[in-house]
Amino acid sequence: MKKSVRSPGSATVINAIATGFGAAFGIGLDIKCCANTQNSSITCSNDVGAPTTLMEICAKKTFEKYGISSDDFGMNFKTESELPMASGLSSSSALSNAVVSISSKIIAEEFNLMPLDDLEIINLAIDASLEAKVTITGSFDDATASYFGGVVVTDNKNRKFIIKEKMEEYPVLVYMPNFGSKSGSSDVGRMKVLSPLVETAFGLARSGDYFKALNLNGLIYANTLGFDSNIAIDALEVGAIASGLSGTGSSFVAICEDEAIDDIKETWSKYEGRVIETKVDNIGCQFIG
């Protein structure tokens, strides 16, 4: 049996590290995962030569959930990614969602078992990400924005939704500097110092004012983590609706109307790195074969 799944990344509205409450929205950059059955063992590979630890943990946890031994039944996983790694665009959440969802579907069909429901998949993927130490909070906001698409506002500590809804499919520009930033190794203490300010930004998100929330959150975290907040301000100056640091960096995102795309690209061209053009994703994780 062979199946393929598409799993998009997400961008930050509110980074949950400071307060435990977060918000994020799906973007049109994704990871594609293809899996096929084999006689035994779990084998994983990707197109970027990165460690496959997270993939292996996701598959192992799904096998354990169903009581399946990889000595008697196996799967081979391969991924191709449009998502830059260690950039604040939820590549780990997208990857874990993809592997858990595809392995669950194959096992359920192969053994005539019930497939995991959406939240079971998400929670298993989060548990795997925590075990792999690629997340600090569990990233329920990132994981659910990736899985469902649209925008989510969440209580990450308790893995609960506050808001889950579709978002207008604006163009999204991503500025990628020539370096990454792993969220699992971020300075948590430094970020928590600013929790009162982040709570103010979260209040905006909770009331549905996502763009102001993104702007404020981005400025707070960029300055706290040593990124150049002028990147976001420059985008706002030339017409972005909202712009800010995504996750713990290193990427910045700008949400805009079509007519502002070229101006934002131009103003960001003075910074070393590259600009990726995508849009808001409202589809989420879906099987494509």
From Swiss-Prot:
Domain of life of the source: Archaea
Catalysed reaction equations from the record: shikimate + ATP = 3-phosphoshikimate + ADP + H(+)
GO CC terms of this entry: cytoplasm
Pathway named in the protein's UniProt entry: Metabolic intermediate biosynthesis; chorismate biosynthesis; chorismate from D-erythrose 4-phosphate and phosphoenolpyruvate: step 5/7
Keywords, sorted A to Z: Amino-acid biosynthesis, Aromatic amino acid biosynthesis, ATP-binding, Cytoplasm, Kinase, Nucleotide-binding, Transferase
Family: Belongs to the GHMP kinase family. Archaeal shikimate kinase subfamily.
Name this protein carries in UniProt: Shikimate kinase
Lineage of origin: Archaea, Methanobacteriati, Methanobacteriota, Methanomada group, Methanobacteria
